[in-house]
Amino acid sequence: MVDGKKTRRVLVKVGGETCKELADRQRLARDLAQVIAGGAEVCVVHGAGPQITELGKQLGLQSVFRAGRRVTDAPMLQAAAMAMAGQVGADLLAACLQAQVPAVSTPAASAGLVVGKKRPPKVVAGEAEPVDYGLVADVALVQPKLLEALWASGFVPLLSSLVCDADGQLLNLNADSLVTALVQALRIDDVILVTGVPGVYRDLADPSTHLPELWDRDIAGLIASGAVQGGMVAKLEEVAAILKKGADRVALVGFQQEHAIAAALQDQPGLRTVVRRSPA
């Protein structure tokens, strides 16, 4: 709180694709620098899907997916830890420090911020038997003390989605699940999803079908009618889950755009989709 005013809290999620190229990481870091210069408290959650797959190949590991989710055995968990907390976390940290962003890179397991539990076998569409995803976590508990302390000291947390269970077993947590858990546990004003596509399109091949604004109540109808398909369905389902957990709005922006995050927070012109929680 500054001068009696509530500090704006912003949660930014970036996928591994966003972090592959140095120029893209530097663009993201410049954007974050502008946002924190405006007084916001920022937390970044990052994935590392492409990096895990590539590192797995180098280590002779085959990536296995069921219903779009990675199956994580013990060797693949080691690759995930190296890719997330090592490669992507370190690369993002370096870009942020270059942009004068006081970032701290750490797994979500640190200080018990997020405690996981091994996901039980799940019934998923298209699979004859329940799927055992291996060393993959569901969220059991969020203890926000670490984030609150980092924010109070002026730092920007960069969180990878590695957690431990109550017995200290390292687990791979989906980055989407980490975002929704943090939104539920903390007072988050805005969530920004930085992706390869700047928002929601009815047809990715047709720029005129871009949807600049939506209410969360519109999402189910768009999916049921087939108006959005493919990866857009999963993205909108993620947005709906985030808004249900308490965020006021979610903006989807493209990582190729300069200062896309700052522009979304300031309602400046730009190519993006903003989804708001419907009034009660």
Predicted regions and their residues:
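C-terminal catalytic "cap/lid" subdomain
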Residues: 2-280
